[in-house]
Structure formats: C-alpha cells, structure tokens
C-alpha cells in the first residue's frame, strides 16, 4: 500500500449535496443515528434489486440519474440496487490528482459523489441507495451514520466487528495481528466505503463492501486519500463467504436500519 501522511479532511467529506444541510446537535452521538426509518407507518417498502453479472459504470450512472428524478416526481419508489462493476476507479468531488498513482491501469470516472478516489471491481458488492430523505429525516450526517450502521450490522452477521471513525467516513476493521503503526496505534483496514450525493434530498451513489475483490487493484490509487491504513475484505479476513451470503445479510440489516423492502 502507498505510504505517507493522512491529510486532514472534514469527517463528512464523502457527501456531495445541493440540499441544505440541517445543523444537528447529535453530531457527536452516532448511536442516535442507528435507525433511519420512514416517518409514515404505512410508507411503501423500498424496492430491492440485484443485478446479474457486471454492470457498466456509465449505464449505472444514467440509471441512477433517471431513477432519482422519478423518485422526486413521485413516479417511482425508493430503491436499493446491488451491483458489481468491472475494474475501474472513480473520483469524488474531493479527489486529489496526486492520489491517482497509475492512471492507465483501469478506466477512471469522475463522478458527482462526495469523497476521493476509490476502486470498484468484481468481488465487491456495491449498493446504490436511492432514498427520499424528506420521507425520513432531512439530516445528512444522520443518513451517513445510518449507512455506516447498515454496514456494521451486515458485518456482524459474520462475526466481524466493523467500526466507524469520526474523522474517516466508512467502516473499519482493527487488525491486531498486523504490526502497529509508527505512532504505536493499532493497524486498521477499511472494509467498506461510503460516497453519496443528494439531489433535493433524494440520495444516490451509496456504499461498497469488499467481499472478495483483488485487493492489489487498490495499489493504483490512494484509497479515499488515506495512505497509512490499508484495505481488507471478508475473504481476506478468513471468511469463506459468497456474494449471496452478503446479499442476505445486507437485506436483513437494511430492514433493521431503514425499514421494509420489496424483493422480486
């Protein structure tokens, strides 16, 4: 993995929004963010789709743009869309060009989501989350923390303790078996990334959980601008899980955090 210093960034740099951000008094109390349920008891369930094979990234962007517009207009339901992509890098709105170490390795897409550079590829479960926050809570920080909670509960199904960090969006796994860092702190690896965008309080983009990707592909970037911590996956942690196993766990955890879903 690349080495270097961690650049300081706002704790919610993974957000890109043109919706007003409501100040929250709960910012330092993530436990309050554990649930992000619809306000109406009879709210329709969230549509849940799983794509087969590898999904072209530009096609995924076009689909999300159209769906977000339809959700805003009230002609489509909220949606969570699970996909895998061919190998590629994406750059968020905070990406530093110096963090793209090998620009010719894979296709690079500039995207409107928050955050910096990340990798997508086979063996990684990407969940695109298109929810109307007006139906839930107009609180961006609460939404991001709820996405983290969703990942944490998914990992718990495999007895993995995922942790959030105030200064680093995403979910992390402590690696006590690895050498400590130069400052004596415990090694931590990132197992899941978050990068979202809001358009008039409808979210898109989402989360990415490493199930069994080729972790060497992260070597072409400084993932999320963080160089002293590495990346890991469920299989890298010694778990013989499949993408199907993760999808089941994601579904159950989603209902716990966000409410009912409708599968096909």
UniProtKB/Swiss-Prot annotation:
Catalytic activity: octanoyl-[ACP] + L-lysyl-[protein] = N(6)-octanoyl-L-lysyl-[protein] + holo-[ACP] + H(+)
TM stretches of this protein: none
Pfam (any one): LplA-B_cat
Annotated Gene Ontology cellular component terms: cytoplasm
EC class (word): transferase
Binding sites annotated in the UniProt record for substrate: 113-120, 193-195, 206-208
Residue ranges of every copy of the BPL/LPL catalytic domain listed in the record: 74-262
Gene3D superfamilies given in the database record: Bira Bifunctional Protein, Domain 2
Residue numbers annotated as active site: 224 (acyl-thioester intermediate)
PROSITE patterns documented for this protein: BPL_LPL_CATALYTIC, LIPB
GO BP field: protein modification process
Key words of the record: Acyltransferase, Cytoplasm, Transferase
Other facts noted in the record for this chain: In the reaction, the free carboxyl group of octanoic acid is attached via an amide linkage to the epsilon-amino group of a specific lysine residue of lipoyl domains of lipoate-dependent enzymes.
HAMAP family, per database record: LipB
Family under the similarity heading: Belongs to the LipB family.
Protein name, entry field: Octanoyltransferase
Species of the source: Brucella melitensis biotype 1 (strain ATCC 23456 / CCUG 17765 / NCTC 10094 / 16M)
């Amino acid at each position: 993995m690349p080495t270097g210093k961690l650049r300081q960034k706002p704790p919610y740099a993974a957000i890109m929004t043109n919706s007003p951000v409501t100040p929250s008094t709960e910012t330092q109390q993530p436990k309050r963010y554990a649930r992000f349920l619809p306000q109406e008891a009879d709210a329709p369930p969230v549509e849940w789709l799983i794509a087969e094979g590898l999904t072209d990234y530009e096609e995924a962007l076009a689909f999300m743009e159209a769906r977000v517009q339809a959700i805003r207009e009230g002609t489509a339901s909220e949606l969570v869309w699970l996909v895998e992509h061919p190998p590629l890098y994406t750059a968020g709105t905070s990406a530093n060009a110096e963090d793209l170490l090998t620009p010719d390795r894979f296709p690079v897409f500039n995207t409107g989501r928050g955050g910096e550079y990340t990798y997508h590829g086979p063996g990684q479960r990407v969940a695109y989350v298109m929810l109307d926050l007006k139906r839930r809570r107009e609180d961006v920080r609460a939404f991001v923390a709820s996405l983290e909670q969703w990942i944490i509960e998914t990992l718990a199904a495999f007895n993995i303790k995922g942790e959030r960090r105030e200064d680093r969006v995403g979910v992390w796994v402590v690696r006590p078996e690895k050498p400590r860092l130069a400052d004596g702190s415990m090694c931590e690896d990132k197992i899941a990334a978050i990068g979202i965008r809001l358009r008039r309080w409808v979210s898109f983009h989402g989360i990415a959980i490493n199930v069994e990707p080729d972790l060497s592909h992260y070597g072409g970037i400084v993932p999320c601008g963080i160089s002293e911590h590495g990346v890991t996956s469920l299989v890298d942690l010694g778990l013989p899980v499949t993408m199907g196993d993760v999808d089941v766990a994601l579904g159950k955890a989603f209902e716990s955090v966000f409410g009912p879903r409708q599968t096909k």
